[in-house]
Curated annotation (Swiss-Prot):
It is an enzyme of class 4 (lyase). Its EC number is 4.1.99.17. GO terms for cellular component: cytosol. Pfam families: ThiC-associated (PF13667), ThiC_Rad_SAM (PF01964). This is Phosphomethylpyrimidine synthase. Pathway: Cofactor biosynthesis; thiamine diphosphate biosynthesis. It comes from Azoarcus sp. (strain BH72). Belongs to the ThiC family.
Length: 638
């Protein structure tokens, strides 16, 4: 074993940078109808408005928080022990699961029995895996269709609302100042939601109904009780996914756990472990036991490792064992490329970039080697039986997505999409949750066609897209080329956006790349929420704009998506503490700040007892008299 891998098992420590609370923020918990429903949010405290701007208190702002216990100073974090099993009681009280005596997966048992892996193994609590009792179905969709509102659904409703109703009522009850603040913070431009059904308030019953219809999913494997329930759907806040994972060329278990904790700190709603290197099973165990967000995988990657990378040697039996292995570890959703059909493969021959999906290319090679449809397609109902025994959601993979804008919206891509719609119907027959993966590389004017076709052919199952990248000319900046497409398709109705880092197409991302990708995609998701008119989406923008106008620099930093970078950029040119209260920044300096000039006009108006328009006119008249008295010279000697 190498030193890094030995270290992770014996002396593993959490990344200190990932557990510090964000500046001027604290974790709060909102209790539901029972004491074990405690929903986390982040409260950002603000300073008072300076006397020169009216001297008024500014209320805290509440934002969605994906970081789990990591940013709670009261939590004891030890990644060797893992996180508390938040959902264990909810799962047990339903009475439809059984604890297995041992792992069901042959490969899982082999790994557990191999003493050479002891140095790598997660040392914390090893729970016996759970599985649905014979004849039972344990999916959130199954409960929803039976009219059951689960604790997970109530948790999600509280989480999505972000205390907005109570917050508004408390402001209105605080007298004239609070009423003014309520009007200012809650002002929001009407959006265009393209036929979505976003309510003013999310209720547990609304969550249940959306899951029952298949318009939203709750990724929550019964073997991942550590996860904090979240929802992916068109009528909820737009979510983002962060990809992590080792490769044959680098990274270690320690680095991947650090990437996970780093991802959720900055706002990753889910994390996909796309490991293709060594010790995939052990890496995944460490990640899941320490993750408060849903974990997704592409099981065919690990199955391929089991046959030494030879796609043609893959079998249904190997893949089935891999699904069970990962389901019993607690993976919450599987990307499965079951829509890559034999007849679609020739349609990629004239593409500029062919088949760019790893999973898609693996299955295409298998189909051609055996000249028949893939076992993912022919055994799809068997896969559904596994999914509903553990509540693993499908993320139906777009194995034929375009890898260049040249190939966008071609026959292969859209043919596969139609097949994914047909597979969705089969999964729903089993009450298995489904989301649909989407492109890819698509120029801006062709994005809406993708969204419209997906809604039509996949019956409004949540869409989950990689970008899309809107141009191919910017290697090193593909977080931006894709962020443009992500904001656009999120506005049109995509439920979750898969981040792209600056390293896309170039290399394995490091921690800084992960952060860049997440911040870019949080920005895209928020822009989409604003454009859709999602209730309350503009509160944070209004608070930050007010702080900016009042030169409350620290509040500006703290209300932003990345307080550290905002402060760093400000302090590059104005590092002194006095600059944190200055009425200007280094862009315009003290005499040309537009906001300072506007405030001067307001002060002048107040002194003169007139409105701002009259103040501007009076000011112009005063300056005209000064000009004439000084000799009416355009240029003066100074």
């Amino acid at each position: 074993m190498n030193a890094k891998e030995h270290f992770i098992a014996t002396e593993a420590k959490v990344d200190e940078a990932a557990i510090a609370p964000l500046p001027n923020s604290r974790k709060i918990y909102v209790e539901g109808s029972r004491p074990d429903i405690r929903v986390p949010m982040r409260e950002i405290r603000q300073s008072d408005t300076p006397a020169s701007f009216g001297a008024e208190p500014n209320p805290p702002i509440f934002v969605y928080d994906c970081s789990g216990p990591y940013t709670d100073p009261a939590a004891k974090i030890d990644i060797r022990s893992g996180l508390p099993a938040l959902r264990a009681g909810w799962i047990a009280e339903r009475g439809d699961t059984e604890q297995l005596a041992d792992l069901s997966s042959e490969y899982g048992r082999q790994r557990a029995a191999d003493p050479r892996l002891d140095e790598l193994r997660f040392p914390g609590l090893h729970r016996k895996p759970l599985r649905a009792r014979a004849g039972a179905n344990v999916t959130q969709m199954h409960y929803a269709r039976r009219g059951i509102v689960t604790p997970e659904m109530e948790y999600i409703a509280i989480r999505e609302n972000l205390r907005r109703k109570d917050y508004l009522e408390s402001l209105l009850a605080a007298g004239p100042t609070g009423q003014k603040m309520a009007a200012l913070l809650t002002r929001q431009h009407p959006g265009q939601n393209f036929g979505a059904a976003i309510p003013n308030e999310i209720t547990p019953e609304f969550v249940r109904d959306e899951v029952a219809r298949g318009r939203a999913i709750i990724p929550a494997n019964i073997n991942h009780p550590e996860t904090e329930p979240m929802i992916i759907g068109r009528n909820f806040l737009v979510k983002i996914n962060a990809n992590i994972g080792n490769s044959a060329l680098g990274s270690s278990i320690a680095e991947e756990v650090d990437k996970m904790t780093w991802s959720i700190r900055w706002g990753g709603d889910t994390v996909m472990d796309l490991s293709t290197g060594k010790n995939i099973h052990e890496t995944r165990e460490w990640i899941i036991r320490n993750s408060p967000v849903p974990i997704g995988t592409v099981p065919i990657y690990q199955a391929l490792e089991k046959v030494d990378g030879k796609a043609e040697d893959l079998t249904w039996e190997i893949f089935r064992d891999t699904l069970i292995e990962q389901a019993e570890q607690g993976v919450d959703y599987f990307t499965i490329h079951a829509g890559v059909l034999l007849r679609y493969i020739p349609l990629t021959a004239n593409r500029m970039t062919g088949i760019v999906s790893r999973g898609g290319s693996i299955m295409a090679k298998w189909c051609l080697a055996h000249h028949k449809e893939s076992f993912l397609y022919t055994h799809f109902e068997d896969i559904c039986e596994i999914m509903k025994a553990y509540d693993v959601a499908f993320s139906l993979g777009d194995g034929l997505r375009p890898g260049s804008i040249y190939d966008a919206n071609d026959e292969a891509q859209l043919g596969e999409l139609k097949t994914l719609g047909e597979l969705t119907d089969i999964a729903w027959k089993h009450d298995v949750q489904v989301m649909i993966e989407g492109p890819g590389h698509v120029p801006l004017h062709m994005i809406k066609e993708n969204m419209d076709l997906q809604l039509e052919q996949c019956k409004e199952a949540p869409f989950y897209t990689l970008g899309p990248l809107t141009t191919d000319i910017a290697p090193g900046y593909d977080h931006i080329t894709s962020g443009i497409g992500a904001a656009t398709i999120g506005w049109y109705g995509t439920a979750m956006l898969c981040y792209v880092t600056p390293k896309e197409h170039l290399g394995l991302p490091n921690k800084q790349d992960v952060k860049e990708g997440i911040i870019t995609y949080k920005l895209a998701a928020h822009a989409a929420d604003l454009a859709k008119g999602h209730p309350g989406a503009q509160i944070r923008d209004n608070a930050l704009s007010k702080a900016r106008f009042e030169f409350r620099w620290e509040d500006q930093f703290n209300l932003g998506l990345d307080p550290d970078k905002a402060k760093e950029f400000h302090d590059e040119t104005l590092p002194k503490e006095s600059a944190k209260v200055a009425h200007f920044c280094s862009m315009c300096g003290p005499h040309f700040c537009s906001m300072k000039i506007t405030q001067d006009v307001r002060d002048f108006a107040a002194q003169q007892g007139v409105d701002e328009a009259e103040a501007l006119q009076k000011g112009m008249e005063v300056k005209a008299v000064e000009f004439v008295k000084s000799g009416a010279e355009v240029y003066r000697n100074v």
